[in-house]
Structure formats: structure tokens, C-alpha cells
């Protein structure tokens, strides 16, 4: 069932006039603890008015993260390090070929509504996928963005993007992960997002037959972000936020 969040009024998350969101790209994989420390520091600075909002694009080395709803049984095989984290959600995989976007926005100033914010993140991904002629969809009982897979059988769907966020003083951090061309076999070692129904799997742009560069995905993400959340300002590649 398609979630009624698809009717989201995208004007619910406007930026203040004249304010730009920093848009930062790291060109080498960032260790997870380093990323979390940088996000927490930036979120605190945003909350205190000492820094601007930020979208941080990066990749991680292969690893698993477990959110606040994660269960020990969701890790089937410890192929890579597992990090417990304060984001919402359960267990997922991060690694090369996956575009992670950490989103640090001041929702108190924009609109303090977590559910609508998550719907906004989904809309951002869906519009990004539209660039590549992929139909991403929301689902009522499954956060993230899904792609119908009738080629696998009736009712089959695969997740192409995961969402997990945390708020502190109404500033968001953590964010989204979009599968561009990761090694999907690494998801076999976990129960992704706690979903055990065999009809629901994981996919990527490459798995769907699209070989695209991360730079092309980044450009699409930035365009779609501007439509949903407002304009951004590109910063030179760095390894920390």
C-alpha cells in the first residue's frame, strides 16, 4: 500500500530567505566513528546558531550499523564491524558504492515534525530516482524508498534507499543511504531493517541495469534537495564535517 505521505506538502520545510544549506562532499571513505563525531559536533553548532545547516555526502568502508530498534538476531554473520548508533531504525549495511547523505537541518526553525521530515527525505530520494527513470515509492509500514520487482514475482519489492535519523534540540543528523553500486551480497549477512518477508529484498541502481557515476547521483541529489528543502552551497571535498 502506498503511504499517504506521498501527498506531503513540500512547502513544510522552507529555509529562511537568503539562507543556503552547506553541501559537502568527502572524496575518500570516512570511518563511521569519525562521521558520528563530526555530525554531533555540527548538529550542536547548528542548534546554538554557530554553524549553518549541512548536507554531507560520503561513503563508508564496509560496516554494519544498528539503530535504536536493532536486535542482536538481525546480525546473521559478522563479516564487518558492527556499530551501535542513536539513529532510528534497525540494522543496515554501509560500504563502497553506496551514497550516504547525512542531513543536518534545524527543524525547529523549519518545522518541528519528525514524520513529515522523514516523508520529505523520502520525497528527496524519489525525485532523485526520477532523474534516472526509476520509480521509487513509499510504503505505509516500511520506511525508506522501494522499487517494485515484478520480474521476481507477484508482490516483490526491493529497497533501494534506507532512512535513519536522530534529532537533538530539533536539529537532525544521520540521514539516508542510496544504493548506487554496492556489493549487495553484504546485505545477506544481516536482516536488513528487520524485514524477514522473502518478498522484500535490496536493490541498487546497478542491479536495476543502470551504471551511473557517483558524481551523476550527487548532481541529481542536489537538484532534488533544492526542490524539497531549499538551495544549497557547494563546498570543496573534505574528509570531516
From Swiss-Prot:
The active site is at 193 (acyl-thioester intermediate). Pfam families: LplA-B_cat. Residues 49-233 form the BPL/LPL catalytic domain. GO terms for molecular function: lipoyl(octanoyl) transferase activity. Its main location: cytoplasm. Its EC number is 2.3.1.181. InterPro entries: aa-tRNA-synth_II/BPL/LPL, BPL_LPL_catalytic, Octanoyltransferase, Octanoyltransferase_CS. Keywords: Acyltransferase, Cytoplasm, Transferase. GO terms for cellular component: cytoplasm. Substrate binds at residues 87-94, 162-164, 175-177. It is an enzyme of class 2 (transferase). Pathway: Protein modification; protein lipoylation via endogenous pathway; protein N(6)-(lipoyl)lysine from octanoyl-[acyl-carrier-protein]: step 1/2. The keyword Aminoacyl-tRNA synthetase does not apply. GO terms for biological process: protein modification process. The record marks 159 as: Lowers pKa of active site Cys. It comes from the Bacteria. SUPFAM superfamilies: Class II aaRS and biotin synthetases. It is found in: Cytoplasm. It catalyses: octanoyl-[ACP] + L-lysyl-[protein] = N(6)-octanoyl-L-lysyl-[protein] + holo-[ACP] + H(+). Catalyzes the transfer of endogenously produced octanoic acid from octanoyl-acyl-carrier-protein onto the lipoyl domains of lipoate-dependent enzymes. Lipoyl-ACP can also act as a substrate although octanoyl-ACP is likely to be the physiological substrate. HAMAP family: LipB (MF_00013). Belongs to the LipB family. In the reaction, the free carboxyl group of octanoic acid is attached via an amide linkage to the epsilon-amino group of a specific lysine residue of lipoyl domains of lipoate-dependent enzymes. This is Octanoyltransferase. The gene is lipB.
Amino acid at each position: 500500500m502506498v503511504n499517504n505521505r506521498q501527498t506531503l506538502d513540500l512547502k513544510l520545510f522552507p529555509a529562511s530567505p537568503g539562507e543556503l544549506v552547506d553541501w559537502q562532499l568527502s572524496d575518500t571513505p570516512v570511518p563511521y566513528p569519525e562521521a558520528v563525531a563530526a555530525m554531533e559536533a555540527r548538529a550542536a553548532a547548528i542548534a546554538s546558531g554557530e554553524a549553518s545547516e549541512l548536507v554531507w555526502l560520503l561513503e563508508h568502508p564496509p560496516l554494519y550499523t544498528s539503530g535504536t530498534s536493532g536486535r542482536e538476531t538481525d546480525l546473521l554473520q559478522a563479516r564487518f564491524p558492527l556499530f551501535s548508533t542513536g539513529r532510528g531504525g534497525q540494522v543496515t549495511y554501509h560500504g563502497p558504492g553506496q551514497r550516504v547523505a547525512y542531513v543536518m537541518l534545524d527543524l525547529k526553525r523549519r518545522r518541528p515534525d519528525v514524520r513529515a521530515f522523514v516523508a520529505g527525505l523520502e520525497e528527496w530520494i524519489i525525485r532523485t530516482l526520477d532523474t534516472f527513470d526509476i520509480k521509487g515509492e513509499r510504503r505505509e509500514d516500511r520506511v525508506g524508498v522501494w522499487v517494485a520487482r515484478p520480474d521476481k514475482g507477484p508482490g516483490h519489492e526491493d529497497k533501494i534507499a534506507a532512512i535513519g535519523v536522530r534529532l537533538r534540540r530539533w536539529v537532525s543528523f544521520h540521514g539516508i543511504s542510496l544504493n548506487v553500486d554496492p556489493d549487495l551480497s553484504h546485505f545477506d549477512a544481516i536482516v536488513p531493517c528487520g524485514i524477514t518477508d522473502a518478498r522484500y529484498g535490496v536493490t541498487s541502481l546497478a542491479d536495476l541495469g543502470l551504471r551511473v557515476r557517483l558524481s551523476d547521483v550527487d548532481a541529481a541529489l542536489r537538484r532534488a534537495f533544492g526542490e524539497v528543502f531549499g538551495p544549497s552551497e557547494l563546498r570543496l571535498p573534505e574528509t570531516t564535517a
